[in-house]
Design a protein with these regions (language model features):
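Hydrophobic alpha-helical transmembrane signal-anchor segments
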Residues: 2-8, 34-40, 53-87
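Short, gly/Ser/Thr-rich active-site loops of penicillin-recognizing serine hydrolases
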Residues: 522-528, 623-655
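Short, small/polar residue-rich loop motifs at catalytic or cofactor-binding pockets
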Residues: 96, 101-105, 312-316, 509
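Beta-lactam-recognizing serine transpeptidase/beta-lactamase-like catalytic domain environment
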Residues: 266-277, 322-363, 368-612, 618, ...
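Small/polar-residue-rich segments within soluble enzyme cores
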Residues: 2-9, 146-153, 164-284, 606
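Conserved, well-ordered alpha-helix/loop/beta-strand core segments that scaffold catalytic motifs
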Residues: 272-316
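Short beta->alpha transition motifs characteristic of CBS
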Residues: 120-125, 129-131, 330-336
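N-terminal targeting leaders characterized by basic, low-complexity, disordered sequences
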Residues: 1-35
Length: 655
């Protein structure tokens, strides 16, 4: 049985209502009661709680941004690894490997006998490090000046200019070029002096090697061993080694060759020895052999230079040509220039005036008028021509170079005495009307090469001026037959006489005989173009008429006679157009001819522009030049003297 307790559950005491405290009464603490607590001050009200936003939107934005960045990295990685992989691999390869150019050696230029006219030699650019000339380095304040004083006479440079380069305004400059293209001998001289100063400085502490900062960069240099000889033909190369004038420019691709290269791996700026280098050798340029004969060129250049000085002329030219082949044996200009030292050259003298100057030829052009008259059977050498002192044609009054009574000349005499009036009368027979005569004459002038380029392809060459007959003025209809109102260059004039000498066949002039490749094999130049201009009969008749100009006492070319040889030639004296004003001022004096007249080998043409001292007549100042150059050429080429006597054609007739 379950025991039942008789205890009752304790009852919770419920406090009754508090009794009111009487005024002045104090509550006494009972025994064991706790002491009364101080009253607790009322608590401050808590600030209202902030309502925090949800972090989820921010987390979404951050996640989205990180996703986009990751996508960009992935896209870029795909681009680098897949799309542009080859490009970057090539760049890496390029950065890893270094390529150096191996310059090709420029081919040389020689005359027809193998004599060097232009060649390439080793040279040095003299350089310096200006920081090695300071007071701190040399312990002296005038180091640049001392070095300049030693270098100036060796380099041929201005001492003050050298000192200025060694003391630049930029104190951090480490490289200056003191001189360009010096010979190995010059660098050896500087190097020996530098070594001597260095040895002295090692032995004596007070001594200073002021050349310690001078160095040299190996290079190459184009040299012309004969100086100004044939400079107008050869031209020159620029500082980059490229042809900039004459044949150096025209044949630049042939002469330059093909640069090679060497390619090797690098690391830290140094070649990696375990990885082989790939080398593509340079292909040297081909050598060029000219038709020029150096000795004949010298004779022509010397003769024209001396005569230009003596006559105080503006300039002049001489051309020597092989009548049979068209090869040019000499082409000389005065004034000239030295391609080794272009800084001292007159800019007006650069180029080749014999091909670039266009001028009115004067009476040397009468041979073409006579060729037309003979070829058209309008007259013969014996045809009578009555030449008055004055002749009215159109609105002009024409005269010869001298006053004279009425001349009774043969056609041969018209050419021998160089009569302008006689030439007008003769060419007037080329047609029933003056218009027809003009057209016939024009066709022959074109056949002789006037108004066309010579075929040399020379830079800057002029083709002259020959207007169609329909554009000829009234006066030109009568002046063109005697060489006024039409312009040519010296090469065209020489070619006219070579055509007559060659039996009426014009052979295009040539300057290049062939090229010699790096393998030493010679390749001849193409055969020149040949064109028949007049018949062989007409050419031979003209040749005999031209002999009268030189041999007959009444001829204008007596100063061109050469003992032992038959000479055919023609003088010319033309009013000259001043290039500066476009008006006539002075004269063009000329002489053209060939020898031996019976078996022509050589043609020589000479012209002088604006002679101001002595005679200006072509026969007087150019005849002697022709003789001097022709004699030299005939001897050089070993042409035997003439055996047959010259033909005597009548010059005058009795009315």
């Amino acid at each position: 049985m379950t025991e039942v307790s008789d205890r009752q559950a304790p009852h919770r005491r419920v406090p009754g209502p508090a009794r009111p405290v009487r005024p002045g009464a104090q509550r006494r603490p009972g025994p064991g009661a706790r002491p009364a607590r101080r009253p607790v001050p009322p608590r401050k009200a808590a600030p209202p709680a902030l309502r925090l936003g949800s972090p989820r939107p921010r987390l979404r934005m951050i996640g989205l941004a990180l996703t986009l960045v990751l996508i960009a990295f992935v896209v870029r990685l795909l681009q680098v690894q897949a799309v542009d992989a080859s490009t970057y691999a090539a760049k890496a390869e390029q950065n890893r490997y270094v390529v150096h150019t191996l310059p090709a050696e420029r081919g040389g230029i020689t005359d027809r006998n193998g004599v060097a006219l232009a060649s390439t030699v080793d040279s040095y650019d003299i350089t310096a490090d200006p920081t090695m000339f300071t007071r701190e380095q040399l312990k002296v304040g005038d180091g640049p000046e001392q070095a300049a004083a030693l270098l100036a006479p060796i380099l041929g440079e201005d001492q003050e200019a050298l000192a200025a380069k060694l003391r630049p305004k930029n104190k951090d400059l480490r490289y200056v070029r003191l001189a360009r293209g010096k010979t190995p001998e010059v660098w050896n001289q500087i190097k020996d002096l530098k070594t001597a100063l260095g040895k002295k400085a090692d032995e004596d502490e007070s001594a200073v090697n002021v050349l310690a900062g001078v160095f040299a960069d190996p290079s190459s240099k184009r040299v012309y061993p004969n100086g100004s000889l044939a400079a107008g033909i050869l031209g020159w190369v620029n500082s980059e080694g490229e042809g900039s004038g004459g044949l150096e420019r025209k044949l630049d691709r042939t002469l330059a060759g093909e640069d090679g290269e060497i390619r090797y791996a690098q690391s830290g700026g140094r070649q990696v020895p375990t990885i082989g280098a790939n080398e593509k050798p340079a292909v040297p340029g081909s050598g060029v052999e000219l038709t020029i004969d150096r000795d004949i060129q010298w004779a022509a250049q010397h003769a024209i230079t001396e005569q230009v000085k003596e006559s105080k002329a503006d300039g002049g030219y001489v051309i020597v040509q092989d009548t049979r082949t068209g090869e040019i044996l000499a082409m000389a200009n005065s004034p000239g220039f030295d391609p080794n030292n272009l800084s001292d050259a007159d800019p007006a003298a650069l180029g080749n005036a014999a091909l670039q100057d266009a001028y009115e030829p004067g009476s040397t052009a009468k041979v073409m008028s006579m060729a037309a008259v003979l070829e058209e059977n309008a007259a013969t050498p014996a045809t009578h021509v009555v030449v008055p002192n004055r002749l009215h044609r159109g609105d002009r009054l024409f005269k010869d170079d001298v006053d004279h009574p009425t001349w009774h000349l043969t056609l041969n005499g018209v050419l021998a005495k160089s009569s302008n009036i006689g030439t007008i009368l003769a060419t007037g027979q080329l047609g029933k009307t003056q218009r027809e005569a003009n057209q016939v004459l024009y066709s022959y002038l074109r056949k002789f090469g006037l108004g066309s380029y010579s075929g040399l392809g020379f830079p800057g060459e002029t083709k002259g001026i020959l207007a169609p007959p329909g554009q000829w003025s009234t006066s030109q209809q009568y002046t063109i037959p005697f060489g006024q109102g039409v312009s040519i260059n010296a090469m065209q004039a020489a070619s006219v006489y070579s055509t007559i000498a060659n039996g009426g066949v014009r052979v295009a002039p040539t300057l290049v005989r062939g090229t010699k490749g790096p393998d030493g094999r010679f390749t001849p130049a193409p055969e020149p173009e040949k064109t028949r201009v007049v018949s062989e009969k007409t050419a031979k008749t003209l040749s005999r008429m031209l002999e009268s100009v030189v041999d007959d006492e009444e001829g204008t070319g007596t100063k061109a006679r050469i003992p032992g040889y038959r000479v055919a030639g023609k003088t010319g004296t033309a009013n000259r157009v001043d290039p500066a004003t476009g008006k006539y001022r002075g004269y063009t004096s000329s002489f053209a001819g060939f020898a031996p007249a019976d078996k022509p080998r050589v043609t020589v043409y000479c012209a002088i522009q604006n002679a101001t001292q002595g005679s200006y007549f072509g026969g007087q100042i150019c005849g002697p030049i022709f003789k001097q150059v022709m004699e030299f050429a005939l001897k050089t080429l070993q042409v035997p003297p003439t055996g047959a006597a010259p033909a005597n054609l009548p010059v005058t007739f009795k009315p």
